[in-house]
Design a protein with these regions (language model features):
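Single, function-defining residue in the core of a domain
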Residues: 2-110, 117-124, 129-482
Length: 482
């Protein structure tokens, strides 16, 4: 991650992130930096609000509609920086997820595709965030792909459907695009139930990466782990075989792991979702090693099973009226001890960071509120907003990860002085946590016992309110000097 001073300065951050972008003309590079700086100062605002100068605004619209500028060019320096940082770590989680970007309120934008149940239009976005496991430090985007949903042709046959590229293949493309880690570095792909595809898991191993995914498919398994990935005969593993020992008989994943006894227990904090509040769940855990047998069609695996460690986490006594938690996790990382099993669970729990990133992109950067003429123009804007949303996560982490650290050690002195006045705390004693909540209160956050951490809207509304006050202080200082 960049040092805090670079992250905190919109101009320094924009120059560091976009100053090396290759757009065929140095003037375009300068324009990219200028637009990114304006966006970084107030990410949730509209382009006219971010660029009040009419000439600068017109130049920005021309930039976003220039065919010679692409999303891939704009995002490339950020991806390269993230990869360089991820190559320095011993272990990195590559957390992957898909989200829908909805432009239903902008019906005149051309080139978009169907999303949801088909009644709305927009595009899909696959993001892979690089995160350090222990500290949860967000290094940046390792890969990102915006794409359009392709409706199935009318009258499509079963064979044609099998040959057509599937939307789910974006998970495999991401693994291929990221590739193999350097020697001595472990990259671990983390995904939810949508990532439970045999082809995705196989692709991770082909790229010498590991994985932790939540199981969705009740696959055929056996316990012949000593045979590793030795090919199994086509179709034979999908039916019981007479005359073979019980260990060699195919079984189903969920039935097997739900028969394992608990070997540990722990309290786990669950992040809030759209349907549920944040809570602490008391869970138990069991784990073991199995072989996942390949699908019947064989093409994705050449008949080779995958040896995986399976970790089941479940809530034996959930609160009344609350659905019990159960995660069945598959990992390629050898798991021999209880401590290692809990660590794999902790890796999976880091998944919320990519969801938070997408929320930051939508709420913190108002990506769905942007009104441009075409999907291609929106892609170019995404090339500027995607790293901006990473910066929002990193800005928040500066205060969250060191709550008792003095705010003056990580934030500009003048900003700390303004917040200290608002919080009615001496600037020299203001901690990062106090500063964080004082800024959020400026955005309407009410800190109650039942309240979770500040949301994107209140946090950034407060941040920009403080920035406005700070600009007023600077202006008043200049006027007094004159």
């Amino acid at each position: 991650m960049m040092n805090p001073s670079t992250i905190l300065s919109a101009l320094q951050w924009a120059e560091d992130t976009f100053g090396s972008v290759h757009l065929g003309d140095v003037r375009r590079t300068k324009r990219a930096v200028a637009i990114a700086c304006a966006i970084a100062q107030e990410p949730a605002a509209s382009l006219p609000a971010q660029l009040p100068d009419e000439a600068a605004l017109e130049a920005t619209y021309r930039f976003l509609h220039t065919p010679d500028v692409t999303y891939e060019q704009l995002i490339a320096p950020h991806i390269a920086q993230t990869r360089a940082e991820a190559s320095k770590q011993q272990q990195v989680l590559l957390i992957q997820d898909t989200t829908e970007v909805d432009y239903q309120q902008h019906p005149t934008t051309t080139g978009l595709g169907p999303i949801g149940n088909g009644s709305h239009h927009g595009y899909l976005l696959q993001s892979v965030l690089a995160v350090v496991p222990e500290s949860r430090e967000v290094l940046g985007l390792m890969h990102q792909e915006p794409f359009l949903r392709q409706p199935a042709p009318k009258g499509e046959t079963k064979r044609q459907r099998a040959q057509r590229e599937r939307e789910s293949q974006v998970w495999e493309r991401s693994v291929q695009a990221i590739g193999t880690p350097p020697d001595g570095v472990q990259w671990i792909h983390v995904g939810d139930r949508y990532s439970d595809m045999f082809s995705f898991l196989s692709q991770c191993r082909q790229q010498q990466c590991d994985f932790v995914v939540r199981a969705a498919q009740d696959r055929c398994v056996d316990v012949l782990v000593e045979q590793a990935n030795a090919p199994v005969p086509p179709r034979s593993h999908h039916r019981r075989r007479a005359g073979q020992p019980a260990a060699a008989q195919p079984q189903h994943l969920f039935e097997v792991v739900r028969g394992w006894s608990a070997v540990g227990e722990q309290d786990v904090h669950l992040e809030a979702t759209k349907q549920t509040k944040a809570r602490v769940a008391h869970v138990v855990l069991s784990f073991g090693c199995l072989r996942l047998l390949p699908p019947e069609h064989q093409q994705v695996s050449q008949g080779r099973p995958l040896v995986v460690w399976v970790i089941r986490v479940w809530e034996p006594e959930p609160p009344e009226g609350v659905e019990a938690l159960e995660w069945i996790l598959l990992t390629s990382v050898p798991t021999a001890t209880l401590a290692q099993a809990w660590q794999r669970v902790d890796w999976y729990r880091a998944r919320w960071i990519v969801e938070d990133y997408h929320q930051g992109l939508k709420t913190g950067c108002s990506i769905e509120e942007r009104h441009l003429q075409s999907y291609e123009a929106l892609r170019r804007l995404l090339g500027l907003l995607a790293p901006t949303a990473v910066r929002l996560l990193q800005l928040r982490a500066v205060a969250r990860e060191t709550p008792e650290r003095l705010a003056s050690e990580i934030l500009p002195t003048d900003l700390v002085q303004v917040v200290a006045l608002l919080a009615k705390v001496p600037a020299a004693a203001l901690t990062a946590q106090q500063c964080w909540f004082a800024i959020a209160r400026c955005g309407g956050y009410l800190r109650r016992r039942s309240s979770g951490p500040p949301g994107w809207k209140t946090l950034w509304k407060g941040w920009f309110y403080v920035q406005t006050l700070l600009e007023g202080v600077h202006l008043a200082t200049r006027l007094s000097l004159n």
